[in-house]
């Protein structure tokens, strides 16, 4: 019998036997063993009939213990020569000493104490011996017998010692794979579990504490071994429950997570490590998820593929999907935060791929997860902020599949721009015209307050058109007298805002990082690659073809492989996702016809019966609709005419509410179903806000339509639409468009008649409109000048019906210039849907659409003055993330202010102009606006920890960098010299943050953020003009 404590301590304190005669050691070892054998035989029932089981005198047990201690010491210290066994080890093997000692333990009461003694003995042998003991079956066999006898034990102490020994054995296996065969065949009677040490570890996979961690570490040794040994991989996949236990264990651990998180304060929007370390159940789940990530990283492809399939079908689909659609907002918000945390914690592409496939392709109750997540951005709850944080994580992955489904697939056809503008997609803005226009949107009322400028830089100026940063591309060096005013962002002799230099540096770094990550993308997305016509054709041809298990590449996958898989969602999203009613996912009867989801059967026999929206949508809608204030609709049947649009919404609110759950509504009617929109939400009602930029537009003659007739000016110059008198002309094209659907939808005739009646009601001018009480969070009132303009507009609307025919003629000539592809039916509708679509047409490519995500983000951005600070910080972060992508389609859509889009598509520039107008309107009615602006700026500076962040963080969420996946380097770390101007302001507000009055808190913080946002966008526009020809091989040299 061996006493583990005394044996271990004595062996550790023993003197080394180096220099002692090996023969002497051998004689001592044999003498000790002879004494032990006498005692063993005395109590062996086979050799002594008087021996009784379990009855061993204490003195004899102690004697065996002392002899075995010395024997183990001699065996461990023996040094072998020339890879041969030492005499002591040879004697141990020949006499089968280890098996006899194990049987001796069994003859006694085989208690937990006895098991622990045996386990510790073998742990010392395998870790401290100078010879490879495990190569010998007489030593390995009793070890396996011991391990088998310990399986199924419930004593924590025994489990701890068992896992420690298993961890040591796996470590030896990883270093010496030659003994693997012995482990497989030593215990042949184990059957399917003949790889015993692996099978014993499986129950401890999800165990918490040090036992679980050691078990997972041991399994990782086996996983790395499987990568080089196909036999091990096949055994694990075919004969063990490793992958099912690992995947379904995630489901069990997830069920123990809190369904509602403790209130973290208004700034909280995502789970950081400091948060989840306080939740033991979440720590346990994250440990298991991290282990899955590690297994997929090092294991054989057979194991990797089986594991990701089990995680998808055993955790994501049956557990996470329903959790994302719980009834209460708190539960949905918590699940969304968990999903965001999971995405940020995963580093292995294969595991990340199935999470992305789940988000982008999976349908829950016939609604794609992506559609549901997108719709929640427009909610008034904190769910909005958590959803924005999730999309920030998704966009930050720089994954082609994600960007293709969110944005690019809607831009590839190029139908959002005029046909004559397609050449401008690849245009290089060498003279920084777009940056100048973006900076020109800075409201005059926001130019005062805290300045971020160094006084000694009054002579600093930058001629951005020199393109000095790009040495590999064409170098343009025009003479100074040749510069136009827009070529120089900073006027000569004018002090330069030092924070703008930091924005430039940050933009340079972010764009380079994004370009480096996008090198593996399958296409350039520049208007030609992928070819728009081929892309549309591939979607049309493959739209009705379903894949039993969709292939989801990350990120090298070709777009035509990913596109058709989301064809059903495209159909639905075009007709259903452009709502003000953010939870109105009322599924039309043609929503998922023709192109089944990734795991649906291919059966399209005819139009399905109308179905109600999913239950979770119906329940959450009851609360969401009551609080939601409205948002910008990218494409409406009223051409963004806010007053008409609002009146129609107010007048039809009850009728539309009753018909929301009816099936197969026409697009025109669906567009009419909206919620009340704030009066200042949408196009500008004043002619003043864009004068600077518009004069620059005309002065530079940058509009490609300048040489053409300008009758339909509001359509051809969408940027000028806010200040043009288009309230009368804009309904005419839409009225004609609606009339094209009259044959299939008689209801649209009533809509047009109703619309005409509303125009008549506007004859009384804007006063009647202002008498209505609209729920706006801020007193954004029209000034007298604007009211006069509304009156003049009302007078012009009296003549609207007389001019209707002329306007329709103009529109006929206008649409003749549109791209031919815009007139074809939607490629996202399968051919099998042709008959059904004749009765239930969906949105076609003749109605340009930039996607639900862009629509809802711009919608939320346009309500910037009503959003909380944290919503605006996340929105700004997402838009700047998108603007950092080098793909010309996306870059031109967001940053090219010269691009002329279709009348129904609003650009980021127009939304920013609308925000500018709202800020100026608010400033005109707020008496203490300058003082409140200074307080707001001081508050923002107070939030920035100047010890590790620069003023560029004014438009960044302080948590954003900490939670971003990828490099841990803070991109906002700037030169110390740049920080000096802000340290003074930091000390001024160090005692307590300024206390902004609650009624004006959100508008004032938005007004303080807006100029910084414009600087960041302008910096991105300028850096793109320099880096668009960057050689890929120079990325590493350029990135700091």
From Swiss-Prot:
Residues 555-613, 653-746, 769-808 are annotated as: Disordered. Transmembrane segments: none annotated. Residues 653-664, 696-719, 783-804 have a biased composition (Basic and acidic residues). GO terms for biological process: protein localization to perinuclear region of cytoplasm. Residues 677-690 have a biased composition (Polar residues). May be a component of the FTS/Hook/FHIP complex (FHF complex), composed of AKTIP/FTS, FHIP1B, and one or more members of the Hook family of proteins HOOK1, HOOK2, and HOOK3. May interact directly with AKTIP/FTS. Probable component of the FTS/Hook/FHIP complex (FHF complex). FHF complex promotes the distribution of AP-4 complex to the perinuclear area of the cell. Belongs to the FHIP family. This is FHF complex subunit HOOK-interacting protein 1A. It comes from Homo sapiens. The lineage of its organism: Eukaryota, Metazoa, Chordata, Craniata, Vertebrata. The gene is FHIP1A.
């Amino acid at each position: 019998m061996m006493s583990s404590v005394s044996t271990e301590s004595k062996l550790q304190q023993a003197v080394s036997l180096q220099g002692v005669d090996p023969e002497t050691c051998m004689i001592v070892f044999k003498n000790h063993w002879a004494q032990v054998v006498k005692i063993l035989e005395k109590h062996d029932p086979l050799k002594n009939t008087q021996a009784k089981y379990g009855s061993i005198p204490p003195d004899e047990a102690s004697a065996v213990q002392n002899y075995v201690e010395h024997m183990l010491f001699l065996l461990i210290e023996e040094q072998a020569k020339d890879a041969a066994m030492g005499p002591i080890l040879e004697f141990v093997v020949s006499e089968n000493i280890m098996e006899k000692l194990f049987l001796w333990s069994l003859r006694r009461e085989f208690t937990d104490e006895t098991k622990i003694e045996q386990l510790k003995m073998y742990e010392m042998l395998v870790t401290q011996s100078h010879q490879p003991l495990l190569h010998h079956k007489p030593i390995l066999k009793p070890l396996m017998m011991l391990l088998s006898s310990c399986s199924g034990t419930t004593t924590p102490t025994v489990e701890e010692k068992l896992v420690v020994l298993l961890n040591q054995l796996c470590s030896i296996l990883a270093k010496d794979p030659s003994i693997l065969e012995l482990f497989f065949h030593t215990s042949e009677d184990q059957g399917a579990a003949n790889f015993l040490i692996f099978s014993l570890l499986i129950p401890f996979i999800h165990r918490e504490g040090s036992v679980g961690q050691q078990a997972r570490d041991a399994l990782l040794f086996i996983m790395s071994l499987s990568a080089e040994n196909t036999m091990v991989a096949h055994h694990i996949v075919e004969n063990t429950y490793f992958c099912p236990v690992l995947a379904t264990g995630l489901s069990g651990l997830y069920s123990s997570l809190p369904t509602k998180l403790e209130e973290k304060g208004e700034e909280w929007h995502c789970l950081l490590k400091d948060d989840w370390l306080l939740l033991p159940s979440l720590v346990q789940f994250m440990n298991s998820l991290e282990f899955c990530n590690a297994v997929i990283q090092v294991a054989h492809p057979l194991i990797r593929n089986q594991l990701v399939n089990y995680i998808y079908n055993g955790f994501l689909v049956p557990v996470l999907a329903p959790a994302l659609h719980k009834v209460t907002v708190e539960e949905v918000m918590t699940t969304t935060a968990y999903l965001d945390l999971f995405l940020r914690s995963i580093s292995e592409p294969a595991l990340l791929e199935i999470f992305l496939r789940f988000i982008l392709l999976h349908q829950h109750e016939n609604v794609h997860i992506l559609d549901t997540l997108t719709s929640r951005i427009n909610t008034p709850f904190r769910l909005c902020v958590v959803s924005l944080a999730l999309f920030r994580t998704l966009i930050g992955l720089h994954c082609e599949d994600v960007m293709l489904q969110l944005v690019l697939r809607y831009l590839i056809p190029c139908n959002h721009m005029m046909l004559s503008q397609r050449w401008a997609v690849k245009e290089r803005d060498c003279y920084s015209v777009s940056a100048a226009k973006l900076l020109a949107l800075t409201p005059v009322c926001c130019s005062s307050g805290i300045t971020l400028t160094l006084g000694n830089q009054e002579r600093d100026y930058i001629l951005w058109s020199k393109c000095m940063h790009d040495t590999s591309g064409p170098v343009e060096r025009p003479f100074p007298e040749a510069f136009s005013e827009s070529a120089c962002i900073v006027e000569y002799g004018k002090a330069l805002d030092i924070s703008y230099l930091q924005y430039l540096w940050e933009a340079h770094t972010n764009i380079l990082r994004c370009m480096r990550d996008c090198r593996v993308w399958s296409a350039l997305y520049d208007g030609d690659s992928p070819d728009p016509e081929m892309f549309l054709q591939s979607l049309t041809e493959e739209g009705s073809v379903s894949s039993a298990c969709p292939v989801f590449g990350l990120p090298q996958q070709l777009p035509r492989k990913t596109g058709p898989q989301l064809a059903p969602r495209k159909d639905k999203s075009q007709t259903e996702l452009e709502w003000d009613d953010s939870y109105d996912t009322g599924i039309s009867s043609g929503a998922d016809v023709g192109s089944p989801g990734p795991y649906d059967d291919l059966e399209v026999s005819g139009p399905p019966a109308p179905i109600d929206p999913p239950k979770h949508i119906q329940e959450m809608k009851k609360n969401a609709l009551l609080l939601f204030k409205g948002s910008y609709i990218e494409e409406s049947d009223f051409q963004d005419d806010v007053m008409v649009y609002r009146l129609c919404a107010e007048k039809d609110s009850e009728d539309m509410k009753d018909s929301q759950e009816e099936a197969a509504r026409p697009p025109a009617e669906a567009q009419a179903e909206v919620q009340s929109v704030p009066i200042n939400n949408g196009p500008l009602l004043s002619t003043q806000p864009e004068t600077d930029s518009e004069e620059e537009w005309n002065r530079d003659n940058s509009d490609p339509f300048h040489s053409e007739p300008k009758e339909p000016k509001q359509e051809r110059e969408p940027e000028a639409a806010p200040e043009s008198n288009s309230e009368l002309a804009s309904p005419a094209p839409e009225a004609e468009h609606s009339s094209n659907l009259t044959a299939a939808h008689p209801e649209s005739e009533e809509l047009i008649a109703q619309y005409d009646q509303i125009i008549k009601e506007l004859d009384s001018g804007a006063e009647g409109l202002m008498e209505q009480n609209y729920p706006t969070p801020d007193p954004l009132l029209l000034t007298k000048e604007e009211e006069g303009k509304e009156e003049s507009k009302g007078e012009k609307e009296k003549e609207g019906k007389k001019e209707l025919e002329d306007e329709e003629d103009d529109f006929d000539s206008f649409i003749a210039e549109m791209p031919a592809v815009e007139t074809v039916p939607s490629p996202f509708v399968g051919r099998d849907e042709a008959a059904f679509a004749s009765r239930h047409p969906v949105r076609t490519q003749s109605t340009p659409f930039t996607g639900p995500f862009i629509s809802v983000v711009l919608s939320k951005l346009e309500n910037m003055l009503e959003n909380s600070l944290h919503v605006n910080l996340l929105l700004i972060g997402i838009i700047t993330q998108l603007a950092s992508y080098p793909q010309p389609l996306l870059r031109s859509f967001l940053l090219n202010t010269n691009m002329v889009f279709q009348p129904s598509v609003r650009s980021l520039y127009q939304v920013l102009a609308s925000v500018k107008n709202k800020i100026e309107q608010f400033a005109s009615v707020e008496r203490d606006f300058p003082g409140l602006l200074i307080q707001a700026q001081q508050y923002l500076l107070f939030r920035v920890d100047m010890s590790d962040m620069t003023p560029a963080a004014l438009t960044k969420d302080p948590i954003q960098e900490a939670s971003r996946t990828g490099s841990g380097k803070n991109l906002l770390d700037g030169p110390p010299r740049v920080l000096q101007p802000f340290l003074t302001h930091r000390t001024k507000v160090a005692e307590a943050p300024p206390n902004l009055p609650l009624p004006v808190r959100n508008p004032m913080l938005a007004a303080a953020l807006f100029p910084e946002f414009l600087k960041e966008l302008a910096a991105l526009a300028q850096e793109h003009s320099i880096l668009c020809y960057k050689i890929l091989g120079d990325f590493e040299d350029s990135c700091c």
